[in-house]
Regions:
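A generic structural micro-feature
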Residues: 7, 53-58, 96-98, 141-143
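Core segments of cupin and vicinal oxygen chelate
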Residues: 18-71, 120
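A cross-kingdom feature marking solvent-exposed beta-strand/loop segments within repeated
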Residues: 45-49, 84-91, 132-141, 145
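Vicinal oxygen chelate
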Residues: 3-7, 11-20, 60-81, 87-167
């Protein structure tokens, strides 16, 4: 609101996903969701590894976002030859969220097209598309018809797609 002090952080620069296979993740985030590859680079050695608590590693970094964006990126970070080995998280339940789990939420006006692409690639869904109506607008979200579907990416990260139609 007007006159409020500025936050000491933000906006979000990126969300980093530690992925097993950047190419498998690109097949979803780039090829189906349509995000642009803003940067794709490889770095290696103890200096970069120590930044993430390792002794040595190779790292592929792929930053994705809407074309020309400087914030709100998704970073796909693939570690290889890591010393010590990268830890593995337990697989979350297939039908509901788990405490400590994060969800990436994206808006789209291409919901049906994206849903078809996800199904063709055999992704696992937490929920099928659900529609709900928000009768009254709030300061941050308009009234309208919302559609939401949640699926899991190749590393079991939940991704929510939200569509919107005005009342």
């Amino acid at each position: 609101h007007a006159g409020a002090e500025m936050s000491s952080v933000g906006p979000i620069k990126r969300v980093t996903l530690w992925v097993r296979d950047a190419d498998a993740s690109l097949a979803i985030y780039r090829d189906v969701l349509g995000l642009e590859v803003l940067e794709d680079k490889r770095i290696a050695g103890p200096m970069i590894a120590q930044m993430v608590g390792l002794q040595d590693a190779k790292l592929r970094i792929v930053h994705l976002g809407p074309k020309g964006s400087t914030h709100g990126w998704i970073g796909l970070y693939e570690l290889s030859e890591a010393k010590p080995a990268v830890a593995t998280l337990a697989t979350p339940p297939p039908d509901r969220p788990a405490y400590g789990q994060a969800t990436i939420v994206l808006t789209t006006d291409r919901g049906s097209e994206i849903l078809q692409g996800l199904r063709e690639r055999g992704v696992r869904f937490m929920t099928t598309p659900r529609e709900y109506t928000k009768e009254a607008a709030s300061d941050v979200m308009p009234a309208g018809h919302y559609t939401e579907v949640i699926f899991f990416d190749p590393d079991n990260v939940p991704v929510s797609l939200i569509g919107f139609r005005a009342l």
